[in-house]
C-alpha cells in the first residue's frame, strides 16, 4: 500500500499539469466570477505596508494563463493558470511568481454569492449588493458559503493554500487588500479575506466549486 501511495504521489504533479493545460479558451478576466451568481474571487498582494489588487495591475492574458506586473514588485511577475471544472461550476487556479521581493504576501478574498443571473459589473470589486445574505463556515484552509432562500439554500466551497489566515471582512472596504483584511467583521456585507506568506518559487493552488442545492 505504501509503495502504491508513493507512486501515485509522484504522478500527482503530472496529472495536475494535464488538468491545467486544457480548456484554455475559457479563461476570463480579473477578478474571477463564478457563473450563476456563485461568487467572486479577488487576488491581491502585500509588500511591506503597501498592497494592491491584481486586477488593478498590468495584466497580460493568453488563453488560460495570466502574467501580471506592477512597480510594487519591480522586475518580478506573477503568473496565474486557470482551469474550469468539467463536472461543477468552479475552477482550479495555480499561482506562481518569479523574482518577487522577500516578505511578500498573497491576499485573496471571496464573496458576493446571490444566485442571480450573470449581469454586467461596473468595476473590479466584489459586488457589495450581492454580499448581504452570505454566511461563511471556515475550517482550516477551506470554507463553505451558504446563500439563497432558506428552503432553496445553495453552497459554494473553496480550498486555499494551507497556512492562509482567513477571516470575515467588510465588503464595503475594498480600497486595498490590507484595508479589506483589517476591516473587521461587523458589517451588513460580509466577505472573507486572507493573507498567505508567499515563499519564493512556491506554487499555490486554489479550488472553488459548487455542489447541488442544499437539502434538508
PLM segments and residue spans:
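Low-complexity, acidic Ser/Thr/Pro/Gly-rich terminal tails and inter-domain linkers that flank the onset
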Residues: 68-85
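Short beta-strand/loop motifs in extracellular/secreted proteins, especially
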Residues: 39-41, 102-106, 204
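An extended acidic
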Residues: 25-72, 146-170
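Bacterial N-terminal signal peptides that target proteins for export
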Residues: 2-13
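Surface-exposed coil/turn segments at beta-strand junctions on protein surfaces, enriched
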Residues: 61, 73, 86, 187, ...
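Beta-strand-rich recognition/accessory modules
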Residues: 164-216
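Bacterial N-terminal signal peptides
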Residues: 13-21
Amino acid at each position: 500500500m505504501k509503495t502504491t501511495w508513493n507512486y501515485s504521489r509522484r504522478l500527482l504533479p503530472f496529472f495536475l499539469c494535464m488538468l491545467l493545460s486544457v480548456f484554455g479558451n475559457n479563461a476570463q478576466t480579473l477578478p474571477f466570477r463564478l457563473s450563476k451568481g456563485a461568487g467572486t474571487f479577488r487576488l491581491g498582494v502585500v509588500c511591506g505596508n503597501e498592497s494592491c489588487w491584481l486586477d488593478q495591475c498590468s495584466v497580460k492574458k493568453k488563453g488560460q494563463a495570466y502574467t501580471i506586473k506592477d512597480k510594487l514588485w519591480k522586475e518580478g511577475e506573477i503568473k496565474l493558470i486557470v482551469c474550469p471544472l468539467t463536472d461543477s461550476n468552479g475552477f482550479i487556479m495555480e499561482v506562481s511568481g518569479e523574482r518577487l521581493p522577500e516578505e511578500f504576501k498573497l491576499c485573496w478574498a471571496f464573496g458576493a454569492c446571490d444566485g442571480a443571473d450573470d449581469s454586467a459589473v461596473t468595476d473590479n470589486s466584489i459586488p457589495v449588493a450581492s454580499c448581504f445574505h452570505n454566511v461563511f463556515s471556515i475550517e482550516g484552509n477551506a470554507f463553505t458559503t451558504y446563500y439563497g432562500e432558506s428552503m432553496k439554500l445553495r453552497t459554494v466551497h473553496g480550498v486555499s493554500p494551507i497556512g492562509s489566515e482567513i477571516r470575515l471582512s467588510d465588503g464595503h472596504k475594498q480600497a486595498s487588500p490590507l484595508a479589506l483584511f483589517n476591516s473587521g467583521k461587523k458589517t451588513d456585507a460580509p466577505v472573507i479575506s486572507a493573507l498567505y506568506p508567499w515563499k519564493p518559487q512556491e506554487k499555490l493552488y486554489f479550488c472553488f466549486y459548487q455542489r447541488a442545492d442544499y437539502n434538508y
